[in-house]
Amino acid sequence: MNYAGRMNSFIFKGQNVLDAIKAYRETKGMTHLEFNYPEHIAGYDLEEIKKAMGDLKVNGFAVRWRNFFLNGDLTNPDEELRQKAITMCKEAADICRELGGSVITLWLENDGFDYPFQMDYEYCFKQVVEAIQEVADYAKDMKISIEYKPYEERNFALIDSTGMTMYL
């Protein structure tokens, strides 16, 4: 049986990613790790991470967009930022692949709205479909997982349910 741990669960105050990997290696039954991109990779050499992992394998990477994407990740009205979000997905796929993983999880945390008519729903939904298709075409060997949270970070997520996720 495989047992994976998310990196955030083991990074305590004053610790770093390498400390968390060590803690996971010492956890009986742990077989796989799940990283957030870019936060768990930034500032580290991949060879350093591979060495720290030892026998542990990578299940996948979850892409996490942060503060400068507050107006949208894959739906950002600033096309440069939107393209940066898509590029981050591709980078996560490359690193996941290099570390032996096979799943990219996308939480569209900022793709949604806080009040009615804040966005052009049809246009933004089309943007999400096109962006995910671009990532899927780029990483054909990867599984793409959509993590939806109906009311996070926005009051209303654009992709807010299993049904909407399947509709993509």
Residue ranges of each PLM-predicted region?
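N-terminal pre-domain/capping segments
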Residues: 1-91, 97
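Active-site acidic/histidine proton-transfer and metal-coordination neighborhood
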Residues: 74-168
